[in-house]
Amino acid sequence: MKHVVSWSGGKDSTAMLLSMIKRGMPIDQIVQMDTGKEFPAMLRHIEKVKKHIHPLKVTTVKLDFDYWFSEHVKTRGVDAGMKGYGWPDFKNRWCTRLKSNAATTTIYSRNKYNPRRSDGVKKYRTDVIQYFGIAYDESKRTLNNLEHEIKYPLIDWKI
């Protein structure tokens, strides 16, 4: 079983990562998203945590925020043909989705897919467990993540 931590550098994912290390939980890979729009203080924090968790290595995936914000041409829905997703907000969470998709692609591109299921849907390997730092009071955010094995340690620990 491969254990992969999705780490944003934010308070919840950092609390999860450090608690997993402290508890001796297995960690095979740490994936961190870089939108290119992080504040300097966040970048310093990320570097500080990387030094603290050494020798564990962090795979940083760079995202082109500017492209998705203003250049990407939408292909579906009422906005088909329009450019860009605009500012992310609580209803328009494209940035969250983009980061999640990039993390999943990075993780599973290094771990082959299972053969297609009988219904033709591509299924991720079941020997990878992905960990997300979602706080206990936000547990409703986890209800739609049923496609592959995902764990939410902060929720399990009621943090």
Where are these regions (language model features)?
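Nucleotide-activated chemistry modules centered on ATP-dependent adenylation/adenylyltransferase
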Residues: M1-I159
